Regions:
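Soluble catalytic domains of enzymes that build or remodel membrane lipids, polysaccharides, and related
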Residues: 1-164
Length: 164
């Protein structure tokens, strides 16, 4: 997996993509700016990727010199880091994946249920807490079994609008 990930990243860079690995870039439009941070998935956490509580992550490099006054969007693979990101004062909007609703989701009476709830407090969709938002995308892939039951492939389009 590490070799294939390195190959994907190399191909993305060859296409001119700016791969955000523990780094922040700034998006400017007119006189406004927002910061966009990408956090790498630490290979040391691979064996803990389903644990609800992770050891403290070193976020200092990714957010170095990011002004607190700027709206920050953070992209991170595993949603369990959201608490640490928020506690550090970042991630006004955090985008995550990884869970895929464990490839099974049942919708009943306007609610969704999944085996993912057994492992994760936050496992799919939007969560708002303390003035910050986490969005967990169900993605398009699968793990182990090439199937998805009730967890439809998802690509999310988010439109940012200025507060008035």
């Amino acid at each position: 997996p590490a070799a294939s990930l390195a190959e994907v990243i190399a191909r993305q860079r060859a296409m001119g993509w700016n791969v955000l690995e523990d780094t922040t870039v700034y998006l400017r439009r007119g006189g406004d700016s927002i910061s966009l941070t990408g956090l790498s998935f630490d290979p040391a956490l691979r064996h803990m990727r389903h644990d609800p509580d992770l050891p403290p992550a070193d976020l200092s490099g990714a957010y170095r010199d990011v002004p607190d006054s700027l709206y920050n969007i953070t992209a991170v693979h595993i949603p369990q880091l959201w608490g640490q990101i928020a506690d550090a004062g970042y991630g006004d909007l955090t985008l995550a994946g990884h869970v895929h609703s464990m490839q099974m989701k049942l919708r009943l009476f306007g609610r969704a249920f999944s085996p993912a709830q057994l492992l994760y407090t936050r496992w799919s969709g939007r969560y708002d807490e303390g003035g910050r938002t986490l969005y967990i995308n169900d993605g398009t892939g699968y793990v182990v079994f090439p199937m998805r039951l009730g967890t439809y492939p998802e690509i999310t389009l988010i439109t940012l609008r200025r507060c008035e």
